[in-house]
């Protein structure tokens, strides 16, 4: 019986649940920064597809969409970059604001440098979760 109980406890930490816990931690962190944010932000792209972001932060001249990555993998980066390409122009036209993005990466396992470089090459700054309390990291959330 204790073996069955242990297996049941392990299922509580399945990948989807860990990802969800990390996303919740990111939302809590952003809320602690005293910025105006919207959790669970949904936006339609030029393709007609809907895309969701865990956080949207609005300013007068720009807005920031935040994507937490519990584990940084190429397929996740590809989906994210497609999403940003699909929504950016339409969103900027609709709001009259510049659309920016930020990737927050759980770095308990060191993320591949080439994937971080890919995000930054396409204009998405990255914040390593272990560095979130540094002033430079907090400044990433300050938008006009």
Q: Predicted regions: what is each one?
A:
Residues 1-20:
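Interdomain/boundary linker segments immediately adjacent to catalytic/signaling cores
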Residues 15, 27-31, 74:
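Conserved mixed alpha/beta catalytic, RNA-binding, or beta-rich assembly cores of soluble enzyme
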Residues 27-47:
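A short acidic/basic microdomain associated with nuclease active sites
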Residues 49-52:
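A short, glycine/Asx- and small/polar-enriched loop/turn
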Residues 56-66:
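Active-site beta-strand-loop-beta-strand hairpin of nuclease catalytic cores
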Residues 72-85, 111:
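Active-site-adjacent loop/helix micro-motif of nuclease/hydrolase catalytic cores
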Residues 95-103:
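Short beta-strand/loop segments at the ligand-binding rim of alpha/beta enzyme cores
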Residues 103-144:
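Domain-level recognition of nuclease-like catalytic cores that cleave nucleotide substrates
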């Amino acid at each position: 019986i204790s073996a069955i109980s242990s297996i049941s406890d392990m299922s509580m930490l399945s990948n989807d649940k860990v990802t969800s816990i990390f996303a919740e931690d990111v939302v809590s962190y952003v809320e602690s920064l005293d910025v105006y944010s919207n959790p669970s932000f949904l936006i339609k792209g030029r393709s007609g597809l809907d895309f969701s972001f865990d956080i949207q932060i609005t300013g007068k001249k720009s807005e920031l969409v935040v994507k937490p990555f519990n584990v940084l993998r190429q397929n996740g980066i590809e989906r994210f970059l497609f999403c940003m390409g699909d929504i950016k122009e339409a969103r900027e036209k609709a709001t009259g604001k510049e659309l920016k993005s930020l990737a927050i990466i759980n770095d308990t396992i060191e993320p591949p440098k080439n994937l971080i470089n890919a995000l930054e090459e396409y204009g998405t700054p990255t914040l390593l979760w272990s560095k979130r309390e540094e002033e430079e990291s907090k400044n990433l959330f300050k938008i006009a």
